[in-house]
Amino acid sequence: MPQNSISAQLSNLHQLVADLEAIENGGKKAISNTIKDVKARAPGWIAQEVTAVYNIKKSEITPSGSGKPKKMAGSIQITGETIEELAITYKGRLLTPVHFGMTPKAPPRGKSYTLKAQVLKGQKKVIGRYLNTRTTGGPFSQRSHNILMGTGNTKSDGTSWIPFQRMSKTRTDIKKLTTISVPQMITSDRTNEAIMLRLNTETSKRLEHHMKRALGL
């Protein structure tokens, strides 16, 4: 009897160890799949939160994956081999108002115009005015404070005009008018809390999904 009892205990122990190993392996696979998911999906989650606040197209932050590549307003990349090591890397230049629904897109010939843009959704604002003074030099005269200048672009999907701001009375002392960058949009007080909540929520969902699949639940 003692021998039979010991044999039964050992048999149960082997099964328990096998079950634990299966759970451990399933857990490792679930974590690995979750990391892959987050790396692939997180840029889209972040872009959705950014575009909910800022008037910029999602396609300018995350590539569509189809069609020919275009110059992006910025980029978002997720790195790390464990959930604890996952890190967000974002890059981007200061953007001109062209990216935020600027009007007019081209200067009306021989007329005064008011430049407007909507950086924050629902908040279209005046960013400059050009008064056609009919003075020598036209739009490049000293009295023209904000002007649209041609970029020389010949492509249908390119930018042909961008705004410049006069910095002094010197005719050539002008500077490209810029607004905000993708990194600034991501770290902004307007979006950062929502982004972190979205990342935590979605990561937990993906981990739970893969754990259930790995354990056959």
Indicate where each model-derived feature is located.
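Short, Lys/Arg-rich flexible segments
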Residues: 1-217
